[in-house]
């Protein structure tokens, strides 16, 4: 019996050693190609949506930890196009004059405790078939990317920065050579990053940047903790910046979302978090003055998780605010109605410039589509 047991143990040891030898090195996969299969706990959460305006059947979505996906069938099906790179996505931006040029900022900017990190900015010139890393490796989270429509090699990146600690690679960065080199053009301090940006629809040298100091800890989140959050404007392509706070809360500010009306650059909307008031502000003079227009629940709930505003391309009084329950206004933000029958937690919205009744929403559950200005929605994916 002892001999049999000893023989069995020797055989198992030999097989174990053989298995370890066979499974080591490149022989493990041979000619097979590995693909990303997880973890998938948050990968369905949509962080951003971009659509080719002249051909809205082509849709790109960036997800929290699932990479970038592309549809050429108006959302009937999607395929992954970024699986060899960082899975956490913050922003996808298209050069609408050359829509095969796609910029991706990695690192989800919606900073709940389940968020994952990015590794900088990537660029494709063939619709996502191949990608090139173009910089800002230590950015960790990118909130926005803006392209100068008159000079497509001039690109601005809003770097939100590290969530759990201070870092210096944050603020607003600019390239004038398509990503070969970068200059930081707006920096507050190592705790304050850029949460959102906007470009004037007629003059690309006019820029807006929402700067945000924030820090996450294991047991709580601190928004605006250094008192350096604020809204800034440049009229010279980022060479100089001025704070534009007239009419905004005078107490400590937190996260701010900013949007300009594509049909009228003087009309701006800002979703503002402060210590005493959270709400929607409106400017009719390109940010010189602001007026509080709405303090509904979904205009202030969880600003670290929802802050984007999308303005109708043709009507400056129609806007969608991303929120726990998304809301839409048709009177410049005075009143909002909830958008029902969609998955809760909406982070991105797109309004078709050719048919403004056509709306896409990016939610924690995927992509939803409306053809009647948000009255009804159907799930696309």
Q: Where are the model-predicted features located?
A:
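Beta-propeller blade termini and top-face loops
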Residues: 20-381
